[in-house]
Amino acid sequence: MEMNDLQPIILPGIPARRPLVIAGPCSAETEEQVLAAARALAAQEVKIFRAGIWKPRTKPGGFEGVGVEGLRWLQRVKAETGMYVSTEVATERHVFEALKAGVDLLWIGARTSANPFAMQELAGALRGVDIPVLVKNPVNPDLELWIGAIERLYNAGLRRLGAIHRGFSSYDRTIYRNQPQWHIPIELRRRLPQLPLLCDPSHIGGKRELIAPLSQEAMDLGFDGLIVESHCTPDEAWSDKQQQVTPDVLCFMLHTLVVRETTQTTEPLAELRQQIDRLDDELLALMAKRMRISREIGQYKKEHSMPILQAKRYDEILNKRGAQAVELGINPESVSYTHLRAHETPEQLV
């Protein structure tokens, strides 16, 4: 599905330039906290305020949001600051309550976008409603599932749609809370070029010191906007305190961003080169991981007096990867060469 008639997420009074910025606390905690954050962000010329009213937590027992009462606080934000307000919805009831309260923009979280049943319920609840809706990527790196979630909303008649890249869960321990895997949103942009694409550096990084570099990387990749968690006293936040920044820090970060024009004639070449660089980074990380596992296998063989080279297993690897290469349109000889080089040292022979 091409979705050629998607519309920009433009709200009156917001300049149509990059980056579109949505900011506010992870959670609406108290009326005073919400209003303080909104006033501080409005003073920094942020136009769209975000706050979680319902918080889907990974485990029970954590703060799960203030619920409907928080929508009244968002109404006060609109009335007192003139900002647009946004929140996350995960059920039909959430949609009903948010629309009734006059929320201007909705987003759908990673746990919800991963569930086709939940997405269909939300699509039904939003049918006939003209409101911007942003869809976060599913928790797992599944581009088709992400596109499918967007398609369900599109099929319900929504045209002001966008996507939020918030990274992907992984068992591997790295500096990120959620792995960026930039090639996935890049492929989403290639498949749906008219779909606005925002980055959530707070959830990707999981640490406030990573928000600025991740935001710059998103701008370098041509993302249209940022959704950032900002709290007046982040160390006292009731949820995700490590990944929130103060409004002043956010303002400084936004002013130091380098936003390059995407209409330059060299932009396609630069974007392709950036894609190659990031794919190379991921390939090297995967190769390093594979080598670590290979060394563990080699050590096991040594401890159990097993031969380092097991020809049958080695032939199986080369034959299987060669067949996969053909299916993917890759020269199988290049794959064989890569495997031979990867197994040059005895401990790498798996």
Q: What does each model-identified segment do?
A:
Residues 50-68, 232-238, 298-304:
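Glycine-rich, proline-tolerant flexible connector loops at the mouths of alpha/beta enzymes
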Residues 1-22:
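N-terminal amphipathic alpha-helix/helix-capping segment at the start of soluble metabolic enzymes
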Residues 64-84, 125-130, 186-194, 245-260:
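Alpha-helix-loop-beta-strand connector modules within alpha/beta enzyme cores
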Residues 129-230:
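Catalytic alpha/beta core domains of metabolic enzymes, predominantly
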Residues 84-91, 104-116, 132-141, 164:
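Catalytic beta/alpha-barrel core
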Residues 338-347:
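Conserved small/polar residues in nucleotide/adenosyl-binding loops
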Residues 56-103, 116-117:
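N-terminal active-site wall of soluble small-molecule enzyme domains
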Residues 61-71, 111-127, 142-148, 178-183, ...:
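Active-site-adjacent beta->alpha loops and helix N-cap segments on the catalytic face
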